[in-house]
Structures are given as C-alpha cells and as structure tokens.
Amino acid sequence: MSNYQFTKPAGPFRLSELAKISGATLYEGKGETFTVSGLAKLSEATSNDLVMLHQKKYVKELKNTAARSCIIGPDYVKFAPDSMYLLVHPNPYKAFALIAQAFYPSEKSSSFIAPSAKIESTALIGSDCSIAHGAYVGNHARIGKRCKIGVNTYIGDGVTIGDNCIIEDNVSIRHAVIGSNVVVYPGARIGQDGFGFASDAEGHYKIPHAGGVIIGNDVEIGANTCIDRGSLGNTVIEDWCRLDNLVQIGHNVKIGKGSIIVAQVGIAGSTELGEHVTLAGQVGVIGHLKIGKGATVLTCSKVLRNVQPGDRVIGYPAISISDWQKQIRFLKTAIKSKNPLKS
C-alpha cells in the first residue's frame, strides 16, 4: 500500500471512470462499479489498490498479489487470476501514467507572494501566482499566469516564463525564455555562462556568452541539471522534452521535440539532436555533432561521430548495436581460445 504521509491520493475511483481516463477496456466488461482507492506495487497492494503488469517477469507477483484490479497488456491477460478485474491497454505504462495523474493531480497555484520575496518594480507577474520566501524576480522579467516560484529561486532580469509553470526551490534562471507548462526541479541552473575559452601558451581567454536559452512548452528539467546559454546564438530545448537529474547541456546545443535525456548525460557545445532522440544514462556526446531523429544512444556510451536518424548505438566509441554484439562475441571467443591473439 502507498505511503500517504506526504501525498494523499484523490479518489476513490470506479474502474469504469479509470477506463475512461486511460483509454483502457474493462476485460469482459467486468468490474465497472468496483472502487479503487489507490495505486500500489504488486507485492504491497491491498484489495482496493490498482496494480500494473507490463513485464512478464512480474507474472508470479501478479498471481500472489492481494489486489483485485490490474492494468495489463493484452498479451498478459492469460496470466491474471480469474477473479481479478482487468483494465486492458496496449500500452499499460501509458495507462498507468494517465491514471496516476488522476490520483495525484498537480498542485494548483494559489495567489501568494511571501513577504521575504523580492520582486523588482518593472517585473510583470501574472494572476494566481505563488512566489515563495527568499525568491527574487529581476527587472523586466515576465512570469505568466498560475505559476509557482519556489524558495530562494532566482529569476534574472528580462527572463520570460509562460503560464502554468512550476519552478522549484533553489533554481537560478538567467538569459532565458521559457514556454508554458514547464517544470524545473530543485537546484537546476539555466542560462549561466557556457564553457568557452581561446587558449595559447600565455593562458585561457574567456569568450563572452551573449546568447540565451530557449525552452519550449511542456518541458521538464530535472534537479541539479545545468543548461548553459549560447555564445552568440541560443541553446534550444524544444517542446515535450524530458531532462532527468544531473544533466549537463553545453552552449548552443539544440534538442529536438520530444527527446528524452536520462541522468548524468553530458552534451558538449553546438551538438544538435533531432526530434524524439533518447540518450540513456551517463551518455557523453562531444561537440558539433548531429544525432538524427528517433536515434537512441544506450547507457554509458560515448558518441564521437554523427548518429543517423533511427540508429541505435552503444559503446565507446558508440557504434551500431549489431556491430557491438559482433565485437563482444569475437572477444569472448578469443579469450577462450588457447592463443587469444589469433582470430
């Protein structure tokens, strides 16, 4: 059962309501009026919790769970107990996400400005905004409607933030234009100087960064992620992108719509990602490369050359998965042979 110490769920909901919310189908029409009070893991659920099965390795837990209702894919219906009510969806994880949003809706912003917040006289603040203690909003900054600005957050001069944004605690934003429905988690740094120097035998000469950061709509920026501003042009994060915690985005990087950047990724300056690119955890990308639309770079890989649209690459240097698998098989064979230096 979920721990409600910090977040209490909405509801309860009837399964018929959850089917409508998620686009799922009630298996054989059973359980329309069954009431669900929360979401839980298979191993921790009570009878009134809703669980999910989206991987075969959890089938045993499904058979032993106390839950009486489950979000499930069509291929796994045969594994469910006969007495269980099933919400069937071709993408159970998506259905779970939509249902979870119903149980845990985003907090509505209330109109409140803390006495210790500092808002410059030329800043424009939209209606129904919440600005917490110690926050600062600079000259000519613009914040849209229904935004939440967290404790000790810094919004620099001229920054623009759209409607319905959540900027959490201890964030700093400079030289940036941010769209609507954006979430920035605690400790993120947006729009600071990029890492650019001209070097010779006498030292390193700082290159001023006169550009900015452009962030689209419906973007999430993880905790302690850093996005450097451009040197002359802008660093751009397009709509629907998701950046995990501890990500480093260098100056003038462009990240295409719907891309996913997982924790501890580093992208060096002026690299461009197409739409719907995925960079898995701890991927490193050198500067001035292009990663094509729909490409995937697997965990811990290091990208040293362009990646074509739709390619899936892995390794150091990153190569196609098929080539990487061939290399691994060859190495295993060579290690087992009496003379590993001979092919």
Curated annotation (Swiss-Prot):
Gene3D superfamilies: Hexapeptide repeat proteins, MurE/MurF, N-terminal domain. GO terms for molecular function: N-acyltransferase activity. GO terms for cellular component: membrane. Pathway: Bacterial outer membrane biogenesis; LPS lipid A biosynthesis. It comes from the Bacteria. Homotrimer. Belongs to the transferase hexapeptide repeat family. LpxD subfamily. Catalyzes the N-acylation of UDP-3-O-acylglucosamine using 3-hydroxyacyl-ACP as the acyl donor. Is involved in the biosynthesis of lipid A, a phosphorylated glycolipid that anchors the lipopolysaccharide to the outer membrane of the cell. This is UDP-3-O-acylglucosamine N-acyltransferase 2. It comes from Legionella pneumophila (strain Paris). The gene is lpxD2.
